[in-house]
Regions:
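N-terminal amphipathic/basic leader segments beginning at the initiator methionine
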Residues: 1-27
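Short glycine/serine/threonine-rich phosphate/pyrophosphate-binding segments
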Residues: 17-20, 42-45, 72-74, 97-103, ...
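Glycine-rich phosphate/diphosphate-binding loops that line cofactor/substrate pockets in enzymes
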Residues: 18-33, 51-56, 84, 330
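Conserved beta-strand elements of the Class I
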Residues: 33-34, 89-91, 132
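N-terminal small/polar loop signature for handling phosphorylated ligands or for N-terminal nucleophile
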Residues: 41-116, 226-238
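A glycine/threonine-rich phosphate-anchoring loop and its flanking beta-alpha core
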Residues: 110-206, 297-300, 304
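Active-site segments that bind and position negatively charged phosphate/pyrophosphate groups
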Residues: 200-326
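Mobile late-domain/C-terminal helix-loop "cap" segments
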Residues: 284-377
Length: 377
């Protein structure tokens, strides 16, 4: 038995951001608070969204003080603006950060309290106001997921909230909005999407339907992410990476992520490492650790990413590990040892292991990891 969750509508194509006002009128509940990032506002990336809402008479306010790794403070500030301006719809335009804040604002407006009150799975009692999610990266997949990740400043802990009430009403994916991503951001968000594809494929909650989405996403991203990194204006690469991110987002929404994400969240929260980079530095090692739990699925992933089938599933899967390793190097993603010292890591290790286990994601891994094994990895 399984369930399937996704937005009520998914709109994909060049120039589709200009239709935001139309969808806000059809699916929203009044004026919209636009939540975005400072660079996106300064550079004009978000302007087609704003102009469309202006023309529809639905632009209420703009909150653009959102970093890539938002905290509960940003949520409180955005919620205050949402209420002061008496908005009834939220339009999130950006990477995972703005979309995560939009979900948290909708959550707290309807249910009160703090983000920590709802951390975990299925703890949100009531749905909030409609969200229209417009990603500018490829990507977090947050535009189609029922998750939000917010860092609690006081504890330096990433809080994961999972509820189908957080799935946006509409996802609008316009490849033109991704052209402004610098190469480093293309790499980090792209590996995040690839990790979604890989983990959703081998997750204990995966189904035949989600695995199909996972495999298509992995193949698409392995092929086109290096092209988008090297040639930011390549239209086909940008389009295919955004589509791969969408497919991976649909897959993990309905099958969950696993050990990589469980370990990456505390790594990012404690040391300020971008989420995609945290995934990247852990991905290959955890794939190798997890291989005995799902050799056939890892082999299918390897073939989807371009590996030539070898004599056994184990051999084919290991060829896939090589593809991932080369891709991470090609994208110039640093190693963990280049990001922090061993002493700094050891000082936070016990807390990070506890937070990883508490998130629930490691329980979905095809090979279960003990706290000691998580610390070793």
């Amino acid at each position: 038995m399984w369930n399937w969750f996704s937005p009520k509508g998914i709109v994909f194509g060049e120039g589709k951001a200009a239709s935001t006002g139309l969808f806000a009128r059809q699916w929203g509940r009044g004026r919209a608070l636009v939540i975005t990032g400072p660079f996106l506002r300064r550079s004009g990336v978000v302007e087609p969204v704003l102009q469309s809402l202006r023309e529809a008479g639905l632009l209420g306010a703009v909150f653009s003080d959102i970093p890539s790794e938002p905290t509960d403070r940003h949520v409180r500030e955005a919620l205050g603006l949402f209420r002061r301006e008496r908005c009834g719809t939220i339009v999130a335009c950006g990477g995972g950060g703005p979309i995560d804040v939009a979900k948290a604002v909708s959550l707290l407006d309807a249910n009160g309290g703090a983000v920590r009150d709802y951390a975990g799975v299925g703890r949100v009692p009531h749905p909030g106001v409609p969200i229209i999610a417009i990603p500018t990266t490829a990507g977090s997949g947050s535009e189609v997921s029922g998750t939000t990740i917010i860092t609690e400043e006081a504890a330096h802990e990433k809080l994961l909230v999972i509820s189908m009430y957080l799935v946006p009403e509409i996802a609008i994916l316009d490849p033109l909005l991704t052209y402004g991503m610098p190469p480093a951001l293309t790499a980090a968000t792209g590996v995040d999407a690839l990790t979604h594809a890989i983990e959703s494929c081998v997750s204990r909650k995966a189904t035949k339907l989600t695995i199909d989405f996972s495999l298509r996403a992995a193949g698409r991203l392995a092929r086109f992410l290096p092209v988008a990194f090297a040639s930011p204006d390549d239209a086909e690469a940008r389009r295919e990476c955004l589509l791969g991110s969408l497919e991976a987002g649909i897959a993990f929404t309905n099958s969950s992520v696993a050990l990589v994400h469980g370990m990456a969240r505390p790594l990012g929260a404690k040391f300020g490492i971008p989420h995609g980079v945290s995934n990247a530095v852990l991905l290959e090692a955890i794939m190798r650790f997890s291989l005995p739990g799902a050799p056939e699925r890892y082999a299918r992933l390897a073939e989807a990413m371009g590996a030539v089938p070898a004599g056994t599933p184990l051999e084919t899967a290991r060829a896939g590990f090589g593809i991932v390793s080369r891709l991470v190097r090609e994208l110039h993603i640093p190693r963990l040892r280049d990001l922090l010292s061993r002493e700094a890591l050891d000082a936070q290790l016990d807390a990070m292991v506890r937070e990883a286990v508490a998130s629930g994601s490691p329980a979905n891994n095809p090979r279960q990891a003990s706290p000691e094994e998580i610390a070793s990895l």
